[in-house]
C-alpha cells in the first residue's frame, strides 16, 4: 500500500476495491481485486495484528472510511454506502469451506486403525499450510507434495504464513517448545524507527480445532523471553497444569490450552500455529521459504 503524507505526521492511504479478477498484466498499487461470489457478494477482511502498547485496536489510525463510486461517477459515503452495499446481509460463504464439518471431523479423529490420540504425534509433527486436501491430509496421512501454498483457511497470504501441529494431552499435560527466534524490530513500546530484522512479526497461537477455528490465545514476539543465544522456551498447557517456572522471569513463556479441548469431541486436543509475517528477502529460514512439506525441517532448521 502506497501512503501519502497528510497534515503533520499523519499518513493517508487509499485502497480501491474492484469487482474484478486480477490478471498477470495488472500491477497497480493500492488496488484490491475482489471478485463477487454467491449472490454478488464480496468479503473484505481488515486485519490489524498488534497495535502499539496503550494504543486502541485500530493502531491509532481509526477505521477506514468507505467511499462507493457508482458507474455514473457519483460518490456515496457513510450510511448511504452501507445501505446500497447491504453490509448487514448474511455471509453467503459456506462455513464448511472455512473449516471441517463436524461429522467429517468426527470421522477423521475416530478412524478404526488409529489410536485415540490421533492425529497428534509424540513428539509433535509440524505441517506447512497447503490446500484444503492437504489440511485433511493431516488426519489421513495423504498430503499432496505438489499442493499449492497460501490456501486452506486462517487467511494466509504472500506476506503471512503458518506452520501447525496438533497436540493431545493424553501424550502429556505439558508441552515444551524450544527453538530459535527470528529477530524482530522492537516497536511495541511505541518506537517509531525500526531496525533491520528477520521478520516483521512472529507469533505462536493455540486453537481449538478446524471445526470451530476458535483461537484460545497467542504469544507475540515481544512477549516471549529470548536467551543470550537467541532461543525461546514456551510451555503449553491448561491453566491447572502450568509449570511454576513458566514465567518470563525464569525465561519461559506460557501459552494456554482450552479446558474443553477441540470444543467438539475431545477435551485433550489443541492445535498450535506459528506465524511469520513479512520476512526479509535475505532471511532463508522463514515459513514463506518452505514450498513443500518435505522441505520444512531443512529450510527452517533451528527456527522450528
Regions found by a protein language model. Give the residues of each.
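A compositional/structural signature for long, glycine/proline-rich flexible linkers
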Residues: 4-304
Amino acid at each position: 500500500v502506497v501512503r501519502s503524507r497528510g497534515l503533520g505526521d499523519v499518513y493517508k492511504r487509499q485502497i480501491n476495491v474492484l469487482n474484478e479478477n486480477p490478471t498477470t498484466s495488472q500491477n497497480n498499487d493500492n488496488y484490491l481485486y475482489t471478485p463477487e461470489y454467491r449472490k454478488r457478494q464480496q468479503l473484505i477482511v481488515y486485519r490489524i495484528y498488534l497495535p502499539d502498547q496503550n494504543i486502541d485496536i485500530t493502531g491509532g489510525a481509526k477505521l477506514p472510511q468507505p467511499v462507493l463510486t457508482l458507474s455514473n461517477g457519483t460518490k456515496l459515503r457513510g450510511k448511504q454506502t452501507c445501505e446500497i452495499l447491504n453490509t448487514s446481509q448474511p455471509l453467503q460463504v459456506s462455513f464448511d469451506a472455512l473449516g471441517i464439518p463436524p461429522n467429517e471431523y468426527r470421522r477423521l479423529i475416530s478412524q478404526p486403525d488409529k489410536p485415540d490420540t490421533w492425529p497428534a504425534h509424540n513428539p509433535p509433527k509440524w505441517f506447512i499450510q497447503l490446500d484444503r486436501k492437504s489440511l485433511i491430509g493431516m488426519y489421513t496421512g495423504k498430503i499432496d507434495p505438489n499442493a499449492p501454498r497460501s490456501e486452506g483457511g486462517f487467511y494466509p497470504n504472500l506476506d503471512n504464513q503458518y506452520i501447525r501441529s496438533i497436540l493431545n494431552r493424553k501424550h502429556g499435560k505439558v508441552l515444551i517448545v524450544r527453538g530459535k527466534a527470528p529477530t524482530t524490530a522492537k516497536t511495541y513500546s511505541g518506537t517509531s524507527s525500526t531496525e533491520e530484522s528477520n521478520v516483521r512479526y512472529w507469533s505462536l497461537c493455540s486453537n481449538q480445532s478446524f471445526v470451530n477455528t476458535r483461537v484460545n490465545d497467542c504469544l507475540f514476539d515481544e512477549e516471549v523471553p529470548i536467551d543470550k543465544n537467541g532461543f525461546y522456551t514456551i510451555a503449553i498447557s491448561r491453566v491447572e497444569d502450568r509449570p511454576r517456572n513458566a514465567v518470563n522471569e525464569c525465561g519461559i513463556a506460557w501459552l494456554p490450552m482450552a479446558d474443553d479441548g477441540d470444543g467438539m469431541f475431545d477435551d485433550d486436543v489443541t492445535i498450535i500455529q506459528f506465524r511469520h509475517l513479512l520476512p526479509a528477502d535475505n532471511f532463508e529460514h522463514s515459513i514463506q521459504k518452505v514450498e513443500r512439506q518435505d522441505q520444512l525441517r531443512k529450510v527452517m532448521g533451528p527456527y522450528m
